[in-house]
């Protein structure tokens, strides 16, 4: 069984569940899970936990995510992307200045309250929002507080005078639960114009980037060397403060004992035999208690 994290560069047209299903067949392994759903039309970084690494999935969700994408002013849909029903169209007689676009983006940086698109996987009373939408049932969408760390215009926007549409490219870095589609829609509202997301690619998630990723096709063509594409579990904890345990302290840790450490970090990665075995969290006065045991007791 493989233990570690494989970063897939997801193609358009696939769900995150599709990727997990294909990996289970390719690797002949059931214990696999993804960390962070990507909509079918969105491409890019999809971290997949294998074997013992599935214990990390909740921690993986907590890390910031980064995206590059394109949006368009002059059109709005109910899904906030090109897959949905058109709700509003307005031909622009002249382009919006890039300065105005940047100023609107800056207003959306920080802690903001978002409402997910009606076509999304958020559950309300046990049912996903897109199911209500497909059945034509009105439902109140729950609001959520998210963090947007960066929202930048990455190139001069492009205005099409014949269509009265203006396209722009952007980069976003945000917390879990942030809908980039909603950010594009919110940008339009700040500008007083309909807006829609036209393209999105995730470039980073759970601490992994596109340069760490492999496509399913490339993996399938090189199955004899599948381990070459798998990141070790320890790679996820590269930015944690790490403590190497001696045999006596390891005996305590593997039995779940609290330990005393001369540290002030909130969480520490405890290593034994050059491998992270557990994550401990601070309880005050130098005491640390178990937060996550990564491997079975040895």
From Swiss-Prot:
Q: Which GO terms describe its biological process?
A: mRNA pseudouridine synthesis; tRNA pseudouridine synthesis
Record's keyword terms, sorted: Isomerase, tRNA processing
Q: Which InterPro entries match?
A: PsdUridine_synth_cat_dom_sf, PsdUridine_synth_N, tRNA_psdUridine_synth_TruB, TruB_C
* Alphabetized GO MF terms: RNA binding; tRNA pseudouridine(55) synthase activity
| TM helices/strands, residue ranges | none
Give the residues annotated as active site. Answer: 39 (nucleophile)
Q: Which Pfam families match?
A: TruB_C_2, TruB_N
The reactions it catalyses are: uridine(55) in tRNA = pseudouridine(55) in tRNA
Q: What is its EC number?
A: 5.4.99.25
What is the purpose of this protein? Answer: Responsible for synthesis of pseudouridine from uracil-55 in the psi GC loop of transfer RNAs.
Q: Which family does it belong to?
A: Belongs to the pseudouridine synthase TruB family. Type 1 subfamily.
What this protein is called in its record is tRNA pseudouridine synthase B
Organism of derivation: Lactobacillus delbrueckii subsp. bulgaricus (strain ATCC BAA-365 / Lb-18)
């Amino acid at each position: 069984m493989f233990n570690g994290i494989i970063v897939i560069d997801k193609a358009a047209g696939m769900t995150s569940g599709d990727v997990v299903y294909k990996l289970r067949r390719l690797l002949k392994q059931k214990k696999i899970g993804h960390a962070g759903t990507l909509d079918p039309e969105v491409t890019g970084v999809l971290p997949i936990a294998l074997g013992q690494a599935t214990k990390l999935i909740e921690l993986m969700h907590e890390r910031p995510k980064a995206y590059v994408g394109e949006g368009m002013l002059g059109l709005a849909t109910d899904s906030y992307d090109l897959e949905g029903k058109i709700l509003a169209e307005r031909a622009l007689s002249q382009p919006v200045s890039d300065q105005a676009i940047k100023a609107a983006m800056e207003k959306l940086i920080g802690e903001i309250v978002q409402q997910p698109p009606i076509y999304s996987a958020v559950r309300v009373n046990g049912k996903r929002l897109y199911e209500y939408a497909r059945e034509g049932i009105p439902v109140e969408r729950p609001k959520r507080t998210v963090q947007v760390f960066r929202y930048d215009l990455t190139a001069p926007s492009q205005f099409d005078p014949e269509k009265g549409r203006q396209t722009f490219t952007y980069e976003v870095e945000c917390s879990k639960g942030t809908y980039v589609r909603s950010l594009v829609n919110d940008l339009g509202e700040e500008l007083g114009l309909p807006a829609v997301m036209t393209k999105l690619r995730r470039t980073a998630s759970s601490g992994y980037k596109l340069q760490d990723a492999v496509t399913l096709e490339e993996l399938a063509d090189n199955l004899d060397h599948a381990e070459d594409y798998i990141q070790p579990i320890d790679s996820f904890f590269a930015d944690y403060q790490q403590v190497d345990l001696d045999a006596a302290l390891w005996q305590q840790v593997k039995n779940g004992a609290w330990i005393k450490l001369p540290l002030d970090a909130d969480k520490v990665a405890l290593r034994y035999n050059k491998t992270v075995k557990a994550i401990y969290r601070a309880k005050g006065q130098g005491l640390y208690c178990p937060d996550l045991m990564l491997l079975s007791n040895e």
